[in-house]
Amino acid sequence: MRRTLPLMLALVVAILVMVIVNVFIGSVKIPVGDICRILVGQGSESEIWTNIILSSRLPQVLTAIVAGAGLAVSGLMMQTIFHNPLAGPSILGISNGASLGVAFVVLLSGQLGGVALSSLGYLGDAAVSVAAIVGAIAVMMLIVWISGKVKGNVTLLIIGVMIGYLATAIIGVLKFLSPEEDVKAFVVWGLGSFSRVSGDQMILFVVLMCILLPLSFLLVKPLNAMLLGDRYAANLGVNVKRARTWIIVCSGTLVAIVTAYCGPIMFIGMAVPHLARGIFRTSDHWKLMPATALCGALLALICNLIARAPGFEGAMPVNSVTALIGAPIIIYVLYRRRKTSYE
């Protein structure tokens, strides 16, 4: 505890600093004085600057914090129940299910309805979000049903990976059969972005995530028991099958919602739990769960800042930035702690 609390406070301070930096720095240069006046409600000489701060940068900051924390916690739960350091939000095919749902809507809308989703504005965005949630939840329910039929985690893991490959194959066929404009729209969605959540959608997104994240913390006890294996957890009185089902449901729902609003951003979920373990040097989920959430939020803010770095028109793909920034950090952490229980 003597080491944990200062580290937690340091992460909170780092997040606050990154929030400020994300608001003040972006691809469009805005004077600091104008930003301060906008934030305190006094407005600015330029309506465009006001719109950039209030409708773009602030929503992106909040989205990055919530999405980063959700993906990181989801990845931590997956790695624990499968005892696999490479497990992440996409390991059971749930992210692929979300992508498949979006593919059906985006790639087939023009052919079946004669209207491209890109021309529908808010309704098109809502259709994409709903399709992603439906696709992810459909795969998650299939995984939950299968988990009640099989005993071993390895079997469930392999089945989940195969479902992911199947979804990817179907997406490939749909892309081959679809016009170039629809394929381009789907590819852009697949790059991931924290800028897609509008003010109207933000309330629902944040409320859902603020419900799911505390629910994840209620699963800390069975997660700690499952660290040493399902048999050990059962000896401690944990209903392993029920706990595994709830963990999959909670983790899968987190992924479904984030993917629906931000696109598939998988790397944070796989990498951040290792980063948190390396920093806090613990496997106790009472400490590791909040640490992972904070690290996920911080990394997402850093990646969002780099994606909108000054000197670039528009924003770089968040998925590319997360991999470029996170992979070297995780390789270093794993190398320094190469005698962990995973090896």
Each PLM stretch: what is its role?
Residues 1-343:
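Alpha-helical transmembrane segments in inner-membrane proteins
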